């Protein structure tokens, strides 16, 4: 197999995933706006959840939200059976991800969320799924096909879900009027944080400065 053929495989995968993201624009409706509004007015935290690849995507979405002004963290729905349910309160909002909207582990978690009167926003590829029906607001993320040549491995679908999570985070940033200095507050170790937050006093050395008395001779 020549290098040109191998490169064409990669190029096609990128085209498929790029198109999958662009296709999501057609599904943008007032549910997206309502989801952003609910997250903006949340008095607690955004609890992002999902299983498998959706869980990995959810963890990244939670990290992006948290670093851009919206308190959030990821929770594995399997862990709630072993004490993690204690981190949740009725002031929170759950953001649940599932391509099918029918993931068993996630659906077993949802009744607990409803019992605690916690509102649910879901991102799925099936607006008629049980998860969508349980949700206060549902955002459809549907792809025509996966970038995987077998149309099996989650590729285009996870990319589209991740991009939709970024869209939520970016919309929230703009609603909050999030500024570079706000960003720096959450990234004190990054280059931007150091540049915006470091003052002259932080780097100035005053206690051990070598001071030469004026009466001292050059030879000394």
Model-identified regions with their sequence ranges:
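An N-terminal, well-structured beta->alpha segment
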Residues: 2-44
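Long, charge-dense, solvent-exposed interaction surfaces that engage phosphate-rich ligands
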Residues: 167-174, 178-189
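Short, glycine-rich nucleotide/cofactor-binding loops
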Residues: 18-28, 96-102, 212-215
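Glycine-rich phosphate-binding loops that contact phosphosugars or nucleotide phosphates
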Residues: 44-163, 169-173
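Alpha-helical scaffold segments in soluble metabolic enzymes
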Residues: 16, 23, 34, 38-41, ...
């Amino acid at each position: 197999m020549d290098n040109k053929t191998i490169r064409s495989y990669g190029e096609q995968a990128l085209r498929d995933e790029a198109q999958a993201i662009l296709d999501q624009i057609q599904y943008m409706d007032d549910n997206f706006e309502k989801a952003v509004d609910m997250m903006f007015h949340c008095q607690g935290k955004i609890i992002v959840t999902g299983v498998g690849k959706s869980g990995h995507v959810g963890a990244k979405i939670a990290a992006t939200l948290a670093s851009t002004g919206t308190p959030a963290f990821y929770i594995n729905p399997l862990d709630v059976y072993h004490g993690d349910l204690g981190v949740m309160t009725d002031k929170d909002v759950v953001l649940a991800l599932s391509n099918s909207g029918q993931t068993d582990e996630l659906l077993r978690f949802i009744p607990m969320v409803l019992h605690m009167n916690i509102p649910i926003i879901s991102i799925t590829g099936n607006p008629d799924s049980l998860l969508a029906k349980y949700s206060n607001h549902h955002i459809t993320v549907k792809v025509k096909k996966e970038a995987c040549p077998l149309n099996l491995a989650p590729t285009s679908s996870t990319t589209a879900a991740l991009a939709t999570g970024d869209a939520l985070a970016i919309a929230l940033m703009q609603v909050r009027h999030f500024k570079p200095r706000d960003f720096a507050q959450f990234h004190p170790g990054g280059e931007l944080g150091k540049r915006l937050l470091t003052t002259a006093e932080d780097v100035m050395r005053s206690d051990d400065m070598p001071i030469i008395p004026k009466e001292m001779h050059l030879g000394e």
